Structures are given as C-alpha cells and as structure tokens.
Amino acid sequence: MFVLRPLIVGLTLNLYAPANHAADIPVAPAPGAVAKALAAAAPGDTLRLVPGTYAETVTINKPVTLLGGPGVVLDPSVPFKPDWKPAADIGPGVFRAAVKQRPRTLFLNGKIVAEVDFREAGESGDWGWKTLLAKGPPRAGFKFIPAIWGYHAGQKAVYLRAPDAKDPATLALTQVTDNVAVVSFRDVDGAALRGVTIAHGFAGVSVGEGARRCVVADCAIGPWDRTGVSISAGASENVVERNRVTRGALEDWAPGDGSKERYEIWQLHKSVGHSDRIGVQLFRAGRANVVRHNHVHETFDGVNVGDYTVESLDKPLPRPDDGRETAIHDNLIERTRDSGIEIGGGAIDVHVYGNVLRQTHGGLRFKVPRVGPVYIHHNVLDGGAPFNVWFSMDDAPARGYVYHNTIVGGTAGVQYSSFVKPHNIGTPNWHFVNNLVVTKNGFFGNRKVEAPVNFAADYNVVVGGGKPYPKDAAKDAHSKYVEKVELEKDLRPSPTGPAIDSGIDLSTYLDGKPLPGCPKGYFKGAAPDAGAFEVK
C-alpha cells in the first residue's frame, strides 16, 4: 500500500523530491490509515480513499491529493457513554456525568447539541447555566433549542438536558475530544482535498500557516462545531470550491419569523456560548484566496473575510493586507442565522460577485472595512430576514462599489444599524449604482445611528421609497422610485418594466476604466439594465 521512492542525485538520497511518475495509491479504512498513507506518500501522489468511514483527523503537509468519492467519510467522533446520574439539584430532566476528558463537541443522533460556556453564563439569572439547563432560554424554553449541554471544569463533569428530558443513557450520543479540524493543511504548496465527506469534527477543514495554492473541492463538510472551512495565518492563493457546507445543529438555524423567541438561538450561542459558527472564514488570511461555487447553509455566517479584533476605528489595523485580493463568487448562501457574507479589516481589492444570498438574517454585512477597494456586483439578495446590505459596528471609510445587484425582500436595501461607537465619518467613499431594490422600506434605512449618510447613490431602480437624500434633489437624481417592478421566478425584471435600460454605462466609471464585470459592450440595450441581470 505504501510506496517509498527515493531519488538518487549524485550520491545524495532525496526522500522528498517528486518522482517522474506520481503514484495513485488506494487507501482502505483502518485505524490511522490516512495518516499513515500521508506519511509514506511522495509529492505528487494521489491517495485514493475507498468507500468507508475513516475515524481520524489528518494533517496534509505534502503536495499530494486526498481523493474521495461517494461513501468516503472522515469522521473522528466516538461514542459517548459515561455514567449518567440525575442532577436533581439543577432541575428535572437534567443529568450529570463525571468524565476524565472534556468533550469538545457533543452530538445526538449525529447532530450538534447546543453548548453553554459555564464561564460566560455564570450560575444565576435567566441566562445562568443552571437556569438554562433546568428551563431553557427565558422566552421559549426548549421549544427551539431542544437540548443543552455544558462542561464544568471544576467538577470535571458534563451536564446535559436532552430533548424531552430523556435519560441520556438511552440516547445515541457521540463526541470529539480534540479541538482541531478533521483535515488541516500546513506548510504545503499545492495539496488538494477532493470529494470527501467531512463529518462530526470540532472544525471541518483548516487551511493554515504555510499553506499555499491548496484546493478544497467537491466535499460535503458537516456537521462541524466551530468553522466549516477556515483560511488563516497568512495562507494564500487557496481555492475552496463546489463544496456543501452546513453546520448540522440539532436546533433549526434558519432565520424563521424573526421573533424574539427564535432570536434566543442566536443569543444562547453568542452571549453564553462560543460565538459565531461560520461556513467559510478568512481570518488573517493571505492574498488571492478564492471561495466559489459553494453551497453554504444553516450556519451563523456564510462566508466571512476580516478580523473580528479590529471592528472599531478606535483599534489599530496592524495587518491591512490580510485578505487582499480575496474573491467570493458564485456561491449559494442561504438560511443563515446571521450574516450571509461579512467584509471587514483592510478589505483591499476584495471582489464579491455572482452570489445568491437567500433568507439570510444579516445579508451582506460590512464590519468596518478600512481601505478597499471592495467590488460587490451581480449578486442576488432574496428574502432578507431582515437585512440586505448592512453597515454595522462603526463607520466604513473604505472605498467600495456596490453595483448591478438585485435585492428583493427584507426591510431596506441598504441600512445603517448596530453601530457600537460611530466616529462621524459615515460611508463617504461608497458608490451604489445600477441596483434593483424591491423591499418593504425601499433603498435606505437608518436604525438609530448617528452617522452621516454620505455615500453616493444614483441610477438605481427602487420599489418602497427610502430615498437616502430626501432633502437634496441634486443627489440621486437619476434613480427611479416606482410603485412596482414585475419579476420573473428567478428575479429577473420584466423586459417591459422600469429596470430596463435604466442604468449608467460602468465600462468607463473608474476614470475612464471599467468596474470589474462591466467591460465595454457588456449591456444589450441603449443602457444597462438595473440589477444583476441584463435582460434586454
């Protein structure tokens, strides 16, 4: 099974140089089989996993391909069968079990059980861990979050309230005990992971320090606890494509009706849990990473690029080049409990286009992008629940262009909301042109933010009002605010409606040069159509 092919160069034995003919090596399920095959592989080899479950986590640190197919699963979880005892002092239906090793993630019937961080929650109050285990969140109880668990470090014990207060000893519980990804790329140029199901990990795939030109493609990634795919530590020129990424929570993570009761799902994880769970995260990533043609659903955030430690203009930006030249395109991102796509940090030369965001709570969210330029175009935002394009946390001084997008549903097309401490800068370098906006509150809404409305907006077609400059007729002079726009099922506007030929030619918008995606001759009629589609 394992092939060692040394190259003789003069009198030197080189164990790591690629052979003239890379090997195609079959690997069958066995304890540690993938790790052993990786250790023995030569650069350029393909490790072809035969169908079955591989119960391990692995690190790829050679330029090899790990190739799966239908029925190939990497799943490091193991049964969790401690000695459960009723914890009557906490509440009916709550059980306790002493453990030698802390579970990092707990699964019930293969789905992730919501975890409370006892350190964050404290013991008392409606959101104290004892109250949550006994009664659930204060408004909905266990209606939307059917099970809750947590680890007590002082007692070295796990507490669990299972669905319907069942005895955990009768349930199919599994765990992972390591806080690592199922597959990690480290110190490697040109490795690939293709066609593998990544299931029941603390994290799915980590593309980290020293990883360059690696590929994660055609994989089913989930369930996972913290992050589906992460690109971090300066990893550059990597591609994440054609994957299905979903967290696999026991509770329903679709945005739902926006009620305060359902909002408690977000509160439990963000306030007393372990914060965001992100489908694809680029955190302090390097240059020119690409995220494309993926289906990301039922996560908190879909795809993020930025750095949560610099989400205020009061904080310095020590690494403005993080995430430079990131491309996020042609993804389907839907039913997210929080943002569909988030952009922050330096955001230099970031391109977001061709994506469909459907029923996302946070839509396309800007978290203090500082520099730019950011190009956001030809996206479809459908059914925002409630946000679409959303400036949050603080003013956004970056230069940005938002054009040829179709926005349907939700409250307003563009909003200021949730500024923690605005700095009276606003968004002076942002341009909104040639967009089609069909929403309840029209183009712009401001949710109690004291920041100047100073972006440029023009040549948009809008249903619902919401003019950004109602007292200045000279601004936004060419936009059309109309009563109705007929849309096809795919949200293309009617060929006889007001969106047709309503835009401005963007092939010369940048000092005579085109905006990305708008080369000379890119439209069919007398002028471009507003929105993501060129109809007529």
Placement of each model-derived feature along the sequence:
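Surface-exposed loop/turn motifs in large extracellular/passenger domains
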Residues: 183-192, 210-215, 231-241, 277-290, ...
